[in-house]
């Protein structure tokens, strides 16, 4: 029986960055890992309606820095920054060190696998037909410039007695190409018939140059210089 490696795991260090970037000795490693897990668990539960894509944790010099990638930064920040300050205090209590929280906006949620999967699950929980939800997600991603997308749902689809798997693909999704920038994520829809699993693969193109090209900050587009009009003498 064929087995598939995790699409993100095999690309770590090639074209995918880690979600936790810190170094610890043997004594501190387990505690750091445990607090990382608890911080992610708390933020995921607290920001369930804020369209959170990923949470990146860094630990510089006895402190913790959490970057929340979200499509709805206004909900995370709250009125005058009250909500984000509350999150910062709880994260500091969980980690036991001073905390800093940064918010990064996801510009195109239709091209983010986690947000697409969450969108499909929320539609399934509202009793939208699964085929319609899948096709809508595929069309939106391709319209916004994805090279390819594959969506798979499995479970008691439409309330059927026997669980089955259905998938829909458009474009190309080259899983064997390690330099391919493939965003993969999953989500679960809790319906009256049981749990329906959703998997999403989005191919955004190939990254040439490895991690150096990934970590390079995007340069802002150069604005054309305005020509100064000479005044009449």
Curated annotation (Swiss-Prot):
InterPro entries: KH_dom (IPR004087), KH_dom-like_a/b (IPR015946), KH_dom_type_2 (IPR004044), KH_sf_prok-type (IPR009019), Ribosomal_S3_C_sf (IPR036419), Ribosomal_uS3_bac-typ (IPR005704), Ribosomal_uS3_C (IPR001351), Ribosomal_uS3_CS (IPR018280). SUPFAM superfamilies: Prokaryotic type KH domain (KH-domain type II), Ribosomal protein S3 C-terminal domain. It comes from the Bacteria. Keywords: Ribonucleoprotein, Ribosomal protein, RNA-binding, rRNA-binding. GO terms for cellular component: cytosolic small ribosomal subunit. GO terms for molecular function: mRNA binding; rRNA binding; structural constituent of ribosome. Residues 28-96 form the KH type-2 domain. One of its GO terms (biological process) is translation. Belongs to the universal ribosomal protein uS3 family. Part of the 30S ribosomal subunit. Forms a tight complex with proteins S10 and S14. Binds the lower part of the 30S subunit head. Binds mRNA in the 70S ribosome, positioning it for translation. This is Small ribosomal subunit protein uS3. It comes from Shigella flexneri. The gene is rpsC.
């Amino acid at each position: 029986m064929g087995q598939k490696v995790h699409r993100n795991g095999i690309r770590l260090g090639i074209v995918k960055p880690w979600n936790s970037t810190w170094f610890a000795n043997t004594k501190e490693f387990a505690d750091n890992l445990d607090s990382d897990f608890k911080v992610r668990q708390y933020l995921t539960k607290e920001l369930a309606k804020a369209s959170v894509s990923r949470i990146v944790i860094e630990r510089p010099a006895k402190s913790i820095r959490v970057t929340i990638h979200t499509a709805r930064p206004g909900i995370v920040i709250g009125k005058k920054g009250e909500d984000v300050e509350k999150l910062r205090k709880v994260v500091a209590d969980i980690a036991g060190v001073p905390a800093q929280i940064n918010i990064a906006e996801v510009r195109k949620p239709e091209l983010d696998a986690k947000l697409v999967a969450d969108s499909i699950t929320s539609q399934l929980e509202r009793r939208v037909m699964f085929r319609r939800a899948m096709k809508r997600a595929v069309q939106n991603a391709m319209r916004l410039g994805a090279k390819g997308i594959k969506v798979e749902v499995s479970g008691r689809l439409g309330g059927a007695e026997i669980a089955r798997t259905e998938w829909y693909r458009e474009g190309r999704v080259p899983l064997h190409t390690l330099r391919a920038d493939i965003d993969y994520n999953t989500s679960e829809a809790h319906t009256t018939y049981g749990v329906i699993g959703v998997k999403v693969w989005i191919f955004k193109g190939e990254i040439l140059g490895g991690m150096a090209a990934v970590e390079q900050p995007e340069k802002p587009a150069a604005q054309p210089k305005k020509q100064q009009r000479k005044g009449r003498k």
